[in-house]
Regions:
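Mature catalytic domains of secreted/periplasmic carbohydrate-active enzymes
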Residues: 1-210, 214-215
Length: 215
């Protein structure tokens, strides 16, 4: 947008031009209002909030606008202190986030979207372990898919998605409608519990000849 204060290597354009920013905020609210009235999304995923304060974005006003049409709308945390769930990026948190709900955002290689020169793809095994790590702490995994300019998905990404499909289909009981597992001091690995909390699932990354479980 021409009134957005884009950052360059040396300066921030329109930093001291409040009228331009006010015009952008009006435009932003207009776009959100149109989306809300026309399409009524169940979820809004914001990004780039760090470039302005909550007051500058009018984050509270945005939340009120979105919920005026759909009181149950879900909003991610990237709106300067507002929203329902946290979105750490590119690395599993060392400990479970304080937020009740959270979702790790991760790329299959090193880039968001499609970058033809980026061939540094993570293996399906590595990404599945990341997924399980998230599940064990009560989180979700948002895995980036970057289609090419013609709309097709790169073969490397298709291979990852197919592996995820095979694995999740086989182990769906230990994935869907589960919650965070037991503390790591009780089991040195990834775990989840079923909704009732009376079934414990252990994720074993390698085939073992013997598993000893003590009471």
């Amino acid at each position: 947008h021409p009134d957005y204060p884009n950052k360059t290597r040396t300066e921030v354009r329109y930093k001291n031009d409040p009228d331009r920013w006010a015009k952008f905020v009006k435009f932003n609210f207009g776009q959100l209002s149109e989306l809300n009235k026309t399409w009524k999304p169940d979820l809004y995923w914001f990004d780039g909030d760090w470039e302005q304060t909550a007051e500058a974005w009018d984050s509270k006003g945005i939340i009120n606008l979105l919920r005026s049409t759909n009181p149950n709308v879900i909003v991610n945390s990237r709106i300067q202190g507002y929203g329902e769930y946290a979105t750490p990026e590119q690395g599993v948190p060392v400990v479970r986030p304080a937020d009740k709900y959270w979702e790790l955002c991760m790329t299959m290689n090193d880039s968001w979207g499609y970058q033809h020169a980026d061939t540094n793809y993570k293996t399906p095994f590595m990404l599945l372990r990341t997924f399980v790590d998230c599940l064990s702490m009560g989180g979700n995994l948002l895995l980036d898919i970057g289609p090419k300019e013609d709309g097709t998905i790169p073969a490397e990404q298709i291979a990852v998605l197919k592996e995820f499909g095979r694995w999740t289909k086989k182990h769906k009981e230990a994935i869907y409608e589960t919650r965070a597992g037991i503390p790591c001091e009780h089991f040195q690995g990834y775990t989840t519990l079923n909704k009732a909390g009376d079934i414990l699932y252990l994720y074993l990354p390698y085939k073992l000849s013997l598993i000893h479980i003590s009471e």
